[in-house]
Amino acid sequence: MKKVGILVGREHSFPESIINSINEKGAGKVTAEMITVGGIRMDEPKRWDVIIDRISHEVPYYRAMLKRMALEGTHIINNPFWWSADDKFFNFSLAAKIGVAIPKTVLLPQHEYIKDITSESLRNLEFPIDWEGVVSYIGFPAFLKPHDGGGWKNVSKIHSLEELWSEYNQSGKLCMTLQEGIEYDQFVRCYCVGKEKVLIMPYDPSKPYLSGMQYVDVESYLSPELHKRVEQDVITICKALGYDLNTVEFAIKDGIPYAIDFMNPAPDAELASVGEYNHRWVVDNLTNFILRKLEEGFDTADYRWTAMLNPPEKQASVKAPAAKPAAKTARSKKAASK
Protein backbone atom coordinates (compact mmCIF):
# COMPACT_ATOMS: atom_id res chain seq x y z
CA MET A 1 0.00 0.00 0.00
CA LYS A 2 1.23 3.49 -0.91
CA LYS A 3 1.05 6.32 1.63
CA VAL A 4 0.65 10.06 1.10
CA GLY A 5 1.43 12.45 3.94
CA ILE A 6 0.13 16.02 4.30
CA LEU A 7 2.25 18.65 6.07
CA VAL A 8 0.05 21.65 6.91
CA GLY A 9 -0.05 25.06 8.54
CA ARG A 10 -3.14 26.98 9.65
CA GLU A 11 -5.39 25.87 6.78
CA HIS A 12 -8.25 23.44 7.41
CA SER A 13 -10.49 22.70 4.42
CA PHE A 14 -7.78 21.88 1.86
CA PRO A 15 -5.94 19.25 3.97
CA GLU A 16 -9.22 17.61 4.91
CA SER A 17 -10.46 17.61 1.31
CA ILE A 18 -7.25 16.22 -0.21
CA ILE A 19 -7.00 13.46 2.43
CA ASN A 20 -10.62 12.42 1.86
CA SER A 21 -10.21 12.57 -1.92
CA ILE A 22 -7.06 10.43 -2.01
CA ASN A 23 -8.50 7.89 0.43
CA GLU A 24 -11.70 7.62 -1.60
CA LYS A 25 -10.08 7.38 -5.04
CA GLY A 26 -7.13 5.34 -3.77
CA ALA A 27 -9.54 2.44 -3.24
CA GLY A 28 -7.43 0.83 -0.53
CA LYS A 29 -4.24 0.91 -2.63
CA VAL A 30 -3.27 4.45 -1.64
CA THR A 31 -4.00 6.14 1.69
CA ALA A 32 -3.47 9.72 2.84
CA GLU A 33 -2.94 11.06 6.34
CA MET A 34 -1.68 14.02 8.34
CA ILE A 35 2.03 13.72 9.07
CA THR A 36 3.24 13.47 12.66
CA VAL A 37 6.98 13.89 13.23
CA GLY A 38 9.30 14.56 16.14
CA GLY A 39 13.04 13.99 16.39
CA ILE A 40 14.20 12.72 13.00
CA ARG A 41 17.08 10.25 13.00
CA MET A 42 19.72 10.52 10.29
CA ASP A 43 18.95 6.89 9.34
CA GLU A 44 15.18 7.42 9.41
CA PRO A 45 13.45 4.85 7.15
CA LYS A 46 10.97 5.78 4.44
CA ARG A 47 7.52 6.43 5.89
CA TRP A 48 5.60 8.06 3.03
CA ASP A 49 5.75 7.67 -0.74
CA VAL A 50 4.54 11.24 -1.31
CA ILE A 51 4.43 14.28 0.97
CA ILE A 52 2.39 17.39 0.13
CA ASP A 53 4.24 20.28 1.75
CA ARG A 54 2.17 23.32 2.72
CA ILE A 55 4.28 24.98 5.42
CA SER A 56 8.03 24.22 5.31
CA HIS A 57 8.79 27.70 3.90
CA GLU A 58 7.90 29.03 7.36
CA VAL A 59 9.24 26.19 9.55
CA PRO A 60 12.96 25.39 8.96
CA TYR A 61 12.69 22.08 10.85
CA TYR A 62 10.08 20.89 8.37
CA ARG A 63 12.24 21.91 5.40
CA ALA A 64 15.26 19.99 6.75
CA MET A 65 13.06 16.99 7.54
CA LEU A 66 11.65 16.95 3.99
CA LYS A 67 15.13 16.95 2.46
CA ARG A 68 15.94 13.91 4.59
CA MET A 69 12.73 12.19 3.45
CA ALA A 70 13.61 12.91 -0.18
CA LEU A 71 16.88 11.04 0.34
CA GLU A 72 14.81 7.89 0.97
CA GLY A 73 12.91 8.31 -2.30
CA THR A 74 9.85 10.14 -0.98
CA HIS A 75 8.45 12.47 -3.65
CA ILE A 76 7.86 15.92 -2.15
CA ILE A 77 5.29 18.34 -3.58
CA ASN A 78 7.12 20.65 -4.01
CA ASN A 79 10.84 19.84 -4.27
CA PRO A 80 12.40 21.17 -1.02
CA PHE A 81 15.87 21.56 -2.53
CA TRP A 82 14.73 23.79 -5.38
CA TRP A 83 12.24 25.63 -3.16
CA SER A 84 15.11 26.49 -0.78
CA ALA A 85 17.23 27.82 -3.65
CA ASP A 86 14.46 29.60 -5.53
CA ASP A 87 13.66 33.32 -5.39
CA LYS A 88 11.34 35.63 -7.30
CA PHE A 89 14.00 37.78 -8.93
CA PHE A 90 15.68 34.71 -10.43
CA ASN A 91 12.27 33.51 -11.59
CA PHE A 92 11.55 36.81 -13.35
CA SER A 93 14.91 36.66 -15.11
CA LEU A 94 14.46 33.01 -16.10
CA ALA A 95 10.90 33.48 -17.38
CA ALA A 96 11.96 36.45 -19.51
CA LYS A 97 14.68 34.32 -21.12
CA ILE A 98 12.19 31.57 -22.06
CA GLY A 99 9.74 33.90 -23.75
CA VAL A 100 7.27 34.89 -21.02
CA ALA A 101 6.36 38.59 -20.79
CA ILE A 102 7.72 40.00 -17.51
CA PRO A 103 7.50 43.61 -16.21
CA LYS A 104 10.87 45.35 -15.97
CA THR A 105 12.41 44.51 -12.58
CA VAL A 106 15.45 45.67 -10.58
CA LEU A 107 17.00 43.91 -7.57
CA LEU A 108 17.96 46.36 -4.81
CA PRO A 109 20.56 46.02 -2.04
CA GLN A 110 19.10 45.70 1.44
CA HIS A 111 18.54 48.84 3.46
CA GLU A 112 19.74 47.22 6.70
CA TYR A 113 21.96 44.26 7.63
CA ILE A 114 22.59 42.05 10.63
CA LYS A 115 24.87 43.63 13.24
CA ASP A 116 27.98 41.66 12.19
CA ILE A 117 27.86 43.21 8.71
CA THR A 118 29.86 46.46 8.66
CA SER A 119 30.76 48.93 5.93
CA GLU A 120 33.92 46.90 5.37
CA SER A 121 31.75 43.88 4.58
CA LEU A 122 29.99 45.84 1.84
CA ARG A 123 32.94 47.16 -0.15
CA ASN A 124 31.57 45.59 -3.34
CA LEU A 125 28.39 47.67 -3.19
CA GLU A 126 27.94 50.92 -5.09
CA PHE A 127 26.88 53.75 -2.81
CA PRO A 128 24.63 55.56 -3.15
CA ILE A 129 22.32 53.54 -5.35
CA ASP A 130 21.75 55.10 -8.77
CA TRP A 131 18.13 55.84 -7.98
CA GLU A 132 17.66 58.02 -11.04
CA GLY A 133 18.89 55.19 -13.26
CA VAL A 134 16.62 52.66 -11.54
CA VAL A 135 13.57 54.89 -11.87
CA SER A 136 14.39 55.77 -15.48
CA TYR A 137 14.39 52.04 -16.32
CA ILE A 138 11.31 51.02 -14.31
CA GLY A 139 9.08 54.10 -14.50
CA PHE A 140 6.02 54.83 -12.36
CA PRO A 141 3.80 53.41 -11.06
CA ALA A 142 5.97 50.61 -9.69
CA PHE A 143 5.81 47.97 -6.98
CA LEU A 144 8.40 47.58 -4.25
CA LYS A 145 8.27 44.01 -2.98
CA PRO A 146 10.53 41.36 -1.41
CA HIS A 147 12.68 39.33 -3.78
CA ASP A 148 11.56 36.23 -1.89
CA GLY A 149 8.16 36.13 -0.23
CA GLY A 150 4.44 35.83 -0.78
CA GLY A 151 0.96 36.57 0.45
CA TRP A 152 1.22 40.19 -0.71
CA LYS A 153 3.33 40.92 2.40
CA ASN A 154 5.53 44.04 2.40
CA VAL A 155 4.31 45.10 -1.06
CA SER A 156 3.97 48.84 -1.77
CA LYS A 157 2.72 50.67 -4.85
CA ILE A 158 5.08 53.53 -5.66
CA HIS A 159 4.24 56.71 -7.58
CA SER A 160 7.31 58.91 -7.09
CA LEU A 161 11.00 58.85 -6.21
CA GLU A 162 10.26 60.37 -2.80
CA GLU A 163 7.70 57.65 -2.09
CA LEU A 164 10.22 55.02 -3.21
CA TRP A 165 12.84 56.35 -0.78
CA SER A 166 10.31 56.43 2.05
CA GLU A 167 9.17 52.82 1.52
CA TYR A 168 12.70 51.54 0.87
CA ASN A 169 13.92 53.13 4.11
CA GLN A 170 11.28 51.10 5.98
CA SER A 171 12.14 47.77 4.32
CA GLY A 172 14.65 46.81 7.03
CA LYS A 173 16.67 43.68 6.31
CA LEU A 174 14.44 42.50 3.47
CA CYS A 175 16.06 42.28 0.05
CA MET A 176 13.64 44.10 -2.25
CA THR A 177 12.85 44.36 -5.94
CA LEU A 178 11.32 47.30 -7.76
CA GLN A 179 9.02 46.18 -10.55
CA GLU A 180 7.23 48.06 -13.28
CA GLY A 181 3.56 48.47 -12.41
CA ILE A 182 1.31 47.15 -15.17
CA GLU A 183 -1.91 49.18 -15.33
CA TYR A 184 -3.87 46.11 -16.30
CA ASP A 185 -7.13 45.71 -18.21
CA GLN A 186 -7.61 42.17 -16.87
CA PHE A 187 -6.03 40.11 -14.11
CA VAL A 188 -5.97 36.34 -13.68
CA ARG A 189 -4.60 33.86 -11.19
CA CYS A 190 -3.93 30.35 -12.45
CA TYR A 191 -3.57 27.02 -10.71
CA CYS A 192 -1.20 24.54 -12.32
CA VAL A 193 -1.08 20.87 -11.29
CA GLY A 194 1.49 18.39 -12.56
CA LYS A 195 2.96 20.96 -14.95
CA GLU A 196 0.08 20.20 -17.33
CA LYS A 197 -3.37 20.97 -15.90
CA VAL A 198 -4.27 24.68 -15.74
CA LEU A 199 -7.25 26.52 -14.25
CA ILE A 200 -7.45 30.23 -15.21
CA MET A 201 -9.36 32.27 -12.60
CA PRO A 202 -10.45 35.90 -13.05
CA TYR A 203 -9.00 37.70 -10.04
CA ASP A 204 -9.29 41.11 -8.38
CA PRO A 205 -6.09 41.86 -6.42
CA SER A 206 -7.59 45.08 -5.05
CA LYS A 207 -9.85 43.07 -2.74
CA PRO A 208 -8.55 41.98 0.71
CA TYR A 209 -6.18 39.01 0.51
CA LEU A 210 -7.78 35.68 1.54
CA SER A 211 -11.15 37.43 1.85
CA GLY A 212 -12.97 35.22 -0.63
CA MET A 213 -13.85 38.31 -2.69
CA GLN A 214 -10.82 38.23 -5.00
CA TYR A 215 -12.04 35.44 -7.26
CA VAL A 216 -14.50 36.86 -9.77
CA ASP A 217 -16.96 34.66 -11.65
CA VAL A 218 -16.88 36.07 -15.19
CA GLU A 219 -17.84 33.82 -18.09
CA SER A 220 -15.53 33.91 -21.15
CA TYR A 221 -13.27 36.38 -19.35
CA LEU A 222 -10.42 35.91 -21.84
CA SER A 223 -10.59 35.57 -25.60
CA PRO A 224 -9.77 32.07 -26.91
CA GLU A 225 -6.39 33.31 -28.19
CA LEU A 226 -5.47 34.98 -24.91
CA HIS A 227 -6.71 31.99 -22.92
CA LYS A 228 -4.43 29.71 -24.95
CA ARG A 229 -1.41 31.97 -24.46
CA VAL A 230 -1.93 32.29 -20.71
CA GLU A 231 -2.35 28.53 -20.39
CA GLN A 232 0.84 27.88 -22.36
CA ASP A 233 2.82 30.47 -20.37
CA VAL A 234 1.70 28.83 -17.11
CA ILE A 235 2.86 25.40 -18.29
CA THR A 236 6.15 26.84 -19.59
CA ILE A 237 6.88 28.51 -16.24
CA CYS A 238 5.98 25.48 -14.13
CA LYS A 239 8.00 23.11 -16.30
CA ALA A 240 11.01 25.43 -16.03
CA LEU A 241 10.68 25.61 -12.23
CA GLY A 242 9.72 21.96 -11.80
CA TYR A 243 6.78 22.66 -9.50
CA ASP A 244 4.01 20.03 -9.34
CA LEU A 245 1.66 22.54 -7.70
CA ASN A 246 1.87 26.29 -8.24
CA THR A 247 -0.09 29.43 -9.01
CA VAL A 248 0.82 32.03 -11.61
CA GLU A 249 -0.59 35.56 -11.69
CA PHE A 250 -0.87 37.69 -14.84
CA ALA A 251 -1.60 41.39 -15.23
CA ILE A 252 -2.95 41.72 -18.77
CA LYS A 253 -2.46 44.98 -20.66
CA ASP A 254 -3.31 45.54 -24.35
CA GLY A 255 -3.65 41.79 -24.86
CA ILE A 256 -0.24 40.96 -23.36
CA PRO A 257 -0.22 38.75 -20.22
CA TYR A 258 2.62 39.89 -17.94
CA ALA A 259 3.53 37.25 -15.36
CA ILE A 260 4.00 39.14 -12.09
CA ASP A 261 4.04 36.35 -9.50
CA PHE A 262 4.71 32.66 -9.95
CA MET A 263 6.70 31.36 -6.99
CA ASN A 264 3.81 29.91 -4.99
CA PRO A 265 4.71 26.27 -4.22
CA ALA A 266 2.11 26.15 -1.41
CA PRO A 267 -0.73 28.15 -2.97
CA ASP A 268 -3.88 29.05 -1.09
CA ALA A 269 -6.62 26.50 -1.75
CA GLU A 270 -8.94 27.09 1.20
CA LEU A 271 -12.63 26.73 0.42
CA ALA A 272 -13.59 30.02 2.08
CA SER A 273 -10.90 31.88 0.17
CA VAL A 274 -10.96 30.46 -3.36
CA GLY A 275 -14.57 29.27 -3.59
CA GLU A 276 -16.16 25.86 -4.10
CA TYR A 277 -15.38 25.38 -7.79
CA ASN A 278 -11.71 26.39 -7.59
CA HIS A 279 -11.18 24.43 -4.38
CA ARG A 280 -12.71 21.31 -5.88
CA TRP A 281 -10.69 21.69 -9.08
CA VAL A 282 -7.31 21.76 -7.34
CA VAL A 283 -8.26 18.91 -4.96
CA ASP A 284 -9.47 16.66 -7.79
CA ASN A 285 -6.58 17.37 -10.13
CA LEU A 286 -3.91 17.01 -7.45
CA THR A 287 -5.47 13.72 -6.34
CA ASN A 288 -5.54 12.39 -9.90
CA PHE A 289 -1.95 13.51 -10.50
CA ILE A 290 -0.64 11.78 -7.36
CA LEU A 291 -2.52 8.53 -8.00
CA ARG A 292 -1.40 8.42 -11.63
CA LYS A 293 2.23 9.12 -10.77
CA LEU A 294 2.25 6.51 -8.01
CA GLU A 295 1.41 3.99 -10.74
CA GLU A 296 3.64 5.37 -13.52
CA GLY A 297 6.46 6.69 -11.35
CA PHE A 298 7.42 10.29 -10.67
CA ASP A 299 10.12 12.04 -12.65
CA THR A 300 13.30 11.51 -10.65
CA ALA A 301 15.30 14.60 -9.72
CA ASP A 302 18.93 14.27 -10.80
CA TYR A 303 21.05 15.18 -7.78
CA ARG A 304 24.83 14.88 -7.72
CA TRP A 305 24.61 12.25 -4.98
CA THR A 306 22.14 10.05 -6.91
CA ALA A 307 24.88 8.21 -8.81
CA MET A 308 26.78 7.63 -5.56
CA LEU A 309 23.76 6.04 -3.91
CA ASN A 310 23.12 3.92 -7.01
CA PRO A 311 26.56 3.27 -8.55
CA PRO A 312 26.78 1.33 -11.85
CA GLU A 313 28.44 -1.67 -10.16
CA LYS A 314 25.55 -1.88 -7.69
CA GLN A 315 23.03 -1.84 -10.52
CA ALA A 316 25.07 -4.41 -12.49
CA SER A 317 25.16 -6.80 -9.52
CA VAL A 318 21.39 -6.83 -9.46
CA LYS A 319 21.18 -7.67 -13.17
CA ALA A 320 24.09 -10.15 -13.29
CA PRO A 321 22.19 -13.37 -12.33
CA ALA A 322 19.95 -13.00 -15.37
CA ALA A 323 22.94 -13.72 -17.65
CA LYS A 324 23.54 -17.28 -16.30
CA PRO A 325 20.55 -19.08 -17.87
CA ALA A 326 21.41 -17.57 -21.25
CA ALA A 327 24.96 -18.97 -21.01
CA LYS A 328 23.70 -22.48 -20.21
CA THR A 329 21.31 -22.38 -23.14
CA ALA A 330 24.09 -21.38 -25.48
CA ARG A 331 26.31 -24.26 -24.30
CA SER A 332 23.54 -26.82 -24.63
CA LYS A 333 22.81 -25.72 -28.19
CA LYS A 334 26.49 -25.96 -29.08
CA ALA A 335 26.68 -29.46 -27.62
CA ALA A 336 23.63 -30.55 -29.57
CA SER A 337 25.12 -29.38 -32.84
CA LYS A 338 28.07 -31.70 -32.34
Give a label for each model feature.
Residues 210-258, 284-298, 302-319:
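A long amphipathic alpha-helix within ATP-dependent nucleotide-binding catalytic cores
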